[in-house]
Amino acid sequence: MTRIYTLANQKGGVGKTTTAINLSAYMANFGQKVLLIDLDPQANATSSLGVDKQTVNKGTYEVLIGSASIANHVLHNPKLKISLLPSSPSLAGAEVELIALENRETLLWNAIQQVQDRYDYILIDCPPSLSILTVNGLVAARDGVIIPVQCEYLALEGLGELTKTLSRVKNSLFPGLKTRGILLTMFDGRTRLGQDVVQDVKSHFPKLVFNTIIPRSIYLAEAPSRGIPISVHAPESHAGLSYAALAREILDQDGIAISEI
């Protein structure tokens, strides 16, 4: 059974792409066949896995507009054991082009169905905005949306806006849309603010917050510049252990036995 999770937040800088990359890496480490789809025109997930976004021949953009098959343009990294549908700057133009297409909100989901039986998990990294690209990511989230939330001021306000968006998409496009979980990121236990945000989010969404909390870490900032996930760059760091714990938590909730490879 393939599980499809979309990582989304309309607010940028919350650790969304960082989570997409590192959750994919640890799930692969734990024996899962993982496809990461970069749906963001900034292509940060693509470059963070060592792929030059300027040299991407065909990727998410071409798949969405129908000029390429998703099956033929997935890149596999044998070292990391992750498959990637890369993005490129050309995806920025899709916003205009997709408006004219029929069933434009379901283009990604239609493409994913061609390959979903090849993977245990498909993770989709959305852009930090409410756009037709993000809507495609939400409609494709057959098993839920993972929402990273930065442990900083106004976190709840941004989360409230996103839940309204999810509700609108659920009511108009995909009745099965649900929140898989809220992930608290960039936590600094030395500050009162960080601790207060954790308590506030947990009190407002008691059944949705993951037990794992991702700390603020220089290692998470360094790894993308080297084109590798934290599981390779600094697996024994607090951040590395935290993302490993998140992968274990999700796999356990999904009833998946873990086998490290």
Regions found by a protein language model. Give the residues of each.
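P-loop NTP-binding core
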Residues: 1-261
